[in-house]
């Protein structure tokens, strides 16, 4: 959306960015006005970054108006001071504004300089972007996500085959650390799904540009789902599964990672597997969208209504004792009976 509407920073904002990156500015608030990115307000340094944080950030958040906030840390990298990039999109703001700000987020980062940004936060409530929320975000990102058996196998492949053509110079050499950014159209689709305005998203990895791209958001019923799964390439899918459970009507978001076995190259398999966890972290933590179930499949034919229901609501398997013969009377059993011949019972032959 950003490139379609032509939203860019004003010359004044660009000039302020250049001065602020390594100056005494602690906070920059950016808003969209008349289809341009403009300076909303700014704050000068006072104390240490964590002492200034809540006092500066929270007072600038409007409950009905999205905005971007760039907050300077006290740490530095090779390009200068490191910054936090906050995207504020309150629940009570108009949907059109939410979409506009979501789609323009990448432009703000580009105009400011992505190399200066250490962390990104997306919030709809103040507690999401407060200092405590930021620390939780950092802690969760630092914790390695659990790996499936398939991912452990792929991790071993990656470690043992460092000389493959995969280029990840700017990323960690572990599956947990590999992350491709979402393109604006993909971010917009996730917000629409969260608001239940669409019911299906298909995403792909651009292996050359190293981004997560939107394929389409076609309306999808359960019977359509198998046909959405490509047979020759991997994909990520989000599906709003509408169903009834124990008398309640539910709408559960299901994530589907489709990988058609060894029809894909090793490079594609490794990248899709390694980017999956970070994508899910972003959807759950940055977009605050709850995912009821995460599924991995090879073939779209697996996706039936019964299969999805059992995945979202797994049956409680009670322990069933094998059939046993009824026990005899309590106490010691009598002597074994003997089959007697004629006359042995006192009867006449």
Swiss-Prot record:
Q: Which residues form a coiled coil?
A: none
Q: List the disulfide bonds.
A: none
GO annotation, biological process: actin filament depolymerization; barbed-end actin filament capping; positive regulation of neuron projection development; regulation of lamellipodium assembly
Q: Which InterPro entries match?
A: ADF-H (IPR002108), ADF-H/Gelsolin-like_dom_sf (IPR029006), Twinfilin (IPR028458)
Cellular component terms, GO, for this chain's entry? actin filament; cytoplasm; myofibril; perinuclear region of cytoplasm
Q: Does the keyword Cytoplasm apply?
A: yes
Functionally, this protein is described as follows: Actin-binding protein involved in motile and morphological processes. Inhibits actin polymerization, likely by sequestering G-actin.
What's the protein called, per UniProt? Twinfilin-2-B
């Amino acid at each position: 959306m950003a490139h379609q509407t032509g939203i860019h920073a004003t010359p004044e904002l660009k000039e302020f960015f250049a001065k602020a990156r390594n100056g005494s500015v602690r906070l920059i608030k950016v808003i969209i006005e008349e289809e341009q990115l403009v300076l909303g307000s700014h704050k000068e340094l006072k104390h240490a970054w964590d002492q200034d944080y809540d006092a500066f950030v929270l007072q600038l958040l409007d409950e009905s108006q999205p905005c971007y906030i760039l907050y300077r840390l006290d740490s530095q990298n090779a390009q200068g001071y490191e910054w936090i990039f906050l995207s504020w999109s309150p629940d009570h703001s108009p949907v059109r504004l939410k979409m506009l700000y979501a789609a323009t987020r990448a432009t703000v980062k580009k105009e400011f300089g992505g190399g200066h940004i250490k962390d990104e936060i997306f919030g709809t409530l103040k507690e999401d972007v407060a200092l405590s929320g930021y620390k939780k975000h950092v802690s969760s990102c630092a914790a390695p996500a659990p790996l499936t058996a398939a991912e452990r196998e792929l991790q071993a492949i990656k470690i043992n085959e460092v000389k493959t053509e995969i280029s990840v110079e700017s990323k960690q050499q572990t599956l947990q650390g590999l992350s491709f950014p979402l393109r604006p159209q993909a971010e917009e689709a996730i917000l629409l799904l969260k608001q239940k305005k669409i019911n299906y998203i298909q995403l792909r990895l651009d292996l050359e540009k190293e981004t997560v791209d939107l394929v389409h958001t076609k309306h999808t019923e359960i019977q359509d789902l198998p046909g959405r799964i490509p047979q020759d390439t991997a994909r990520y899918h989000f599906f709003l599964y509408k169903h009834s459970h124990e008398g309640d009507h539910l709408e559960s978001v299901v994530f589907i990672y489709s990988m058609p076995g060894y029809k894909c190259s090793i490079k594609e398999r490794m990248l899709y597997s390694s980017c999956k966890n970070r994508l899910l972290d972003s959807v759950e933590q940055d977009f605050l969208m709850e995912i009821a179930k995460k599924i991995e499949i090879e073939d779209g034919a697996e996706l039936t209504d019964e299969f999805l229901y059992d995945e979202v609501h797994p049956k409680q398997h009670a322990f069933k004792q094998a059939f046993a013969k009824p026990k005899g009377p309590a106490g010691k059993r009598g002597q074994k009976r003997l089959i007697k011949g004629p006359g042995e019972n006192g009867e006449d032959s």
